[in-house]
Amino acid sequence: MLTEVDRLLVATPDAAAGVNAWKRVLGAEVVRHDAVPGLGAVRTVVRAGRSDVEFLQPDGTGPVADALARRGRAHVWAAGAASPDPAAAARTARSAGARVEAEGDRYHVELEIEGAPIRFVVSPEAERQPAGRLDFLYEATVLAADQAGAVARIRDAFGLDETGFTTITSELFGYTGVLTLFRPGQLHRFEVITPIDSTKTMGRYHAREGASFYMGFAEAQDLTAIEAAIPAGGVTIDRPEGRSPSLNPDQVWIHPPTLGGVMLGVSRPSMAWMWSGFPERVTPL
């Protein structure tokens, strides 16, 4: 059982640049620096809200170096989720055909989706001291051509209850998708998206990279403070016509160059329910 999306892992040739970007834009704080021999990387972890972002920089050969050699740029390499029993979650994933490796009290889970390694990390539940302008991460997005197949792989690997899943469609961004909501009443999920318009940004990304992580999404109380911290051209803002600039937009999308290779959406509190199956839960401004 998974309870929340608790981290993103970023493969990067320059961890310091990524860390500094998250500190500058989101007020994130460094909480850990160590080596991960099994990944052939050094790791710098920043706290962003109640969630963590791990920057992995190669210090030799291994899967992080391989991913960077293939992609040629920093990118979301894996997504993490918390579980009350990571060992049990690992057994479920292994029985579903995933490749599983232990790292201390957490587990790396690798699924093959359309020939690509899609990686996750399952960690114990933990109370974290919040830092910065975010409240918490709640979503990591996987792009896949075979949406049903990818959803089934993730469902089976993590023992998720598909009766809680909901669908999502966007003509504006050119996709259809499924939100694999972990628990009733909570936003945390993996999003599986199939681009349907090759002329749009997501469609072009998928055509170039294939099955892969695309972005993360978070919630924050004060999106205006995040707006103010981002250089011109580094963010797309969704503020309804007529709403005062002093009030929160509904959401923003922070572009990858602004955050060290990570595309991050940030929504105001409750707003994500608008596209998560329960629009009545959205608090109006």
Positions of PLM-derived features:
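ER-lumen resident redox/N-glycosylation machinery signature
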Residues: 29, 34-35, 60-70, 127, ...
